[in-house]
């Protein structure tokens, strides 16, 4: 019976065939496994002669055609290869000649904008911060601001004038503190006396209430103001702050020194 008329058996893909039960060890797996079609048998490769094989051809650049035919409706794509993916085209002869001649390659507008202009000294000088009063230049804005605040002679001559008197001040804060001596915004509610500072008003109110929170640690005296206590502590110290030039006596207060000088200082002979 010919092999082409063999009866097809149900094939199980998960089960390995038993080659000992077959007439030939060649197993044919075809995508069309139907009972109505016979399965052809391919002969063994040993029966093929050496002349059936084509000789091995070596691919060289000389053997490649200059222009391969393309189907109609398709245009050739430059810079691409069918097997190796994208291949960058070789540089043209004009570009290579310019590079070897020493001329610069073209630069895009974005690269030219981002490239630092180090060759232009005027551009570097323009980036410095210059004082408009004394023409001094600084590399940072903070250095220029510090110069204007402290070291610039022209800036130090700028002053703020008081509208109530002829006094002038360098800073605006000092002028505002001086204006309080004219306006006297702190007013006593008991007697109507006005003061320029709130702590001066607080010390004045203690004269009405009789409160003396600052007491001397050496004696029983107490004071309403801290400055009066500091002046009193000079009486207990061995070295007084104010000294007479004639008799070298020392006093705790300037007022006591003035009384001593007005009474007639006795010069020691």
Swiss-Prot record:
Spans annotated as SNAG domain: 1-20
Zinc finger (C2H2-type): 129-151, 160-182, 186-208, 214-236, 242-265
Assigned GO CC terms: chromatin; cytoplasm; cytosol; nucleoplasm; nucleus
UniProt organism field: Mus musculus (Mouse)
Keywords assigned: Cytoplasm, Developmental protein, DNA-binding, Metal-binding, Nucleus, Repeat, Repressor, Transcription, Transcription regulation, Ubl conjugation, Zinc, Zinc-finger
SUPFAM superfamilies: beta-beta-alpha zinc fingers
Matching PROSITE patterns: ZINC_FINGER_C2H2_1 (PS00028), ZINC_FINGER_C2H2_2 (PS50157)
UniProt key word DNA-binding: yes
Region (Disordered): 81-117
Gene Ontology MF, one: DNA-binding transcription factor activity, RNA polymerase II-specific
Protein name: Zinc finger protein SNAI2
Assembly behavior: Interacts (via SNAG domain) with LIMD1 (via LIM domains), WTIP (via LIM domains) and AJUBA (via LIM domains). Interacts (via zinc fingers) with KPNA2, KPNB1, and TNPO1. May interact (via zinc fingers) with IPO7.
Record's comment describing the protein's domains: Repression activity depends on the C-terminal DNA-binding zinc fingers and on the N-terminal repression domain.
Family membership: Belongs to the snail C2H2-type zinc-finger protein family.
GO biological process: cartilage morphogenesis; cell migration involved in endocardial cushion formation; cellular response to epidermal growth factor stimulus; cellular response to ionizing radiation; cellular response to platelet-derived growth factor stimulus; chromatin organization; desmosome disassembly; endothelial cell migration
């Amino acid at each position: 019976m010919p092999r082409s008329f063999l009866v097809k058996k149900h094939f199980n893909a998960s089960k390995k065939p038993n080659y000992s039960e077959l007439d030939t060890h060649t197993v044919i797996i075809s995508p069309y496994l139907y009972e109505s079609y016979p399965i052809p048998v391919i002969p063994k490769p040993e029966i093929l002669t050496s002349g059936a094989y084509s000789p091995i051809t070596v691919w060289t650049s000389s053997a490649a055609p200059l222009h391969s035919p393309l189907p109609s409706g398709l245009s050739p794509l430059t810079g691409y290869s069918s097997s190796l993916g994208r291949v960058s085209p070789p540089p043209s002869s004009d570009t290579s000649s310019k590079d070897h001649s020493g001329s610069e390659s073209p630069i895009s507008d974005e690269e030219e904008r981002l490239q630092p202009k180090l060759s232009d000294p005027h551009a570097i000088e323009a980036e410095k911060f210059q004082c408009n009063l004394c023409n001094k230049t600084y590399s940072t804005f903070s250095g220029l601001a510090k110069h204007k605040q402290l070291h610039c002679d022209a800036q130090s001559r700028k002053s703020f004038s008081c509208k109530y008197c002829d006094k002038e001040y360098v800073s605006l804060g000092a002028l505002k503190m001086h204006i309080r001596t004219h306006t006297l915004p702190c007013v006593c509610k008991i007697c109507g006396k006005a003061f320029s500072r709130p702590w001066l008003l607080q010390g004045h109110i203690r004269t009405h209430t009789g409160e003396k929170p600052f007491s001397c640690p050496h004696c029983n005296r107490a004071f309403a103001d801290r400055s009066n206590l500091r002046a009193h502590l000079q009486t207990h110290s061995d070295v007084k702050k104010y000294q007479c030039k004639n008799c070298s006596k020392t006093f705790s207060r300037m007022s006591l020194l003035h009384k001593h000088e007005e009474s007639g200082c006795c010069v020691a002979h």
